[in-house]
Amino acid sequence: MNMKKFIVAAVALIMGINGLSAQQVRFFAHRGGRKEFEENTLNTFKACNAKGMNGFETDVRLTSDGQFVISHDANLKRMFGSDVIIEEHTLKELKTYRTKEGNELMTLDELLDFLKDKKGLYVEFEMKTTDVEAYPQEKLEKYCDKLYKAVMKAKPADATFLFTSFDVRAIRYMTGKYPDGDYLYIIGEPVSDKVIALASALNVKRIGCTIEGTSRAAVTEAHKAGLIVSLWPGNSPADFMLGVSLGADFLCSDVPLAVMEWIKQTPWIDVVY
């Protein structure tokens, strides 16, 4: 047993013995559950939702003719087998490609239409704008304006829809122009004083940090600063339990169904899907 699994097992045992049930964590599917389904496809969101999952993370890009599509990568090569850049092609052109399982590139409108009648949703819309050449400032601002309006118009009354990004430019613009929105700054680092200070400077109340390297003490400090802590990536039930033990408020997973099955053994954890 490696050290991570040992720690997780010990934490689970202690929590179970003590009957702790106060901690609530919101659990959501990364790209719809990218290691269990074809990521970011409509069929993936449908399949995951059918199993009881109402929390999702997804990625939004802009085609050359100004249409929003759902894709983590700028290039279709990994998922569609074609060396094609999304931002350089029209929606009509991009819709001709298929994944190995026959799925087409999903539009934001198609995803929002699927979500419109779902209850208790938590959805992160990641703004994929870090490439400054593809998204210079003027284009970035138009992207943000259009995305905010489209998402908020489609938001069910009881849903939590938030905008996330690694791109400081996008976060800063959105918080400045749309202060009533919900935002999360993503960073490929553990929770730290530096990240807490950056979140304050960006005027966001949520941070998305790496599980690896994050300590419970750091999460406690983030909470003291009024921040909501989301941790990633989640590749296993062990990662989920580690995130719980660290005190995370939100946990993202590539294997949501596997974790949901495992959670049945941990009734002392209050998990919202």
Question: What is each stretch, according to the model?
Answer:
Residues M1-Q24:
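Bacterial Sec-dependent N-terminal signal peptides
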